[in-house]
Amino acid sequence: MSSAGKVASLPEVAKRVAAARGGGKQIALANGVFDLLHVGHIRYLEGAKALADVLVVAINADASARANKGPGRPVVPAPERAELVAALACTDHVLIFDEPNVRGVISALQPDVHVKGTDYTPETIPEREAVLAYG
């Protein structure tokens, strides 16, 4: 699939995930701003992909990126950040979300694995309760 074909809306990604799950595939979800893509992002996403058959990456929309990163951010607009992340071999599906966290995305996709960066502990993951809600 081309990188442009990997970027889709949450409802479309949910359909793709359901089809993959129906085929016995494990689903991982990673999320972040991914502004000024760097090697740490690549390592995070490659590590996430190693945990499942299908990797979905949820990217913060510009407004939520600005709320998280501060004024002047993001440098790169969300559609371009999505396209950059989609161009990586390790990603299967990419979506843009406009909430402060990915609880809604987690509830919609119910991934087998929700992957966060090393700056979080299990206790400090904002979406912890959303993951625990479906097991």
Label each residue range with its predicted role:
Residues 1-135:
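Nucleotidyltransferase catalytic core that binds NTPs
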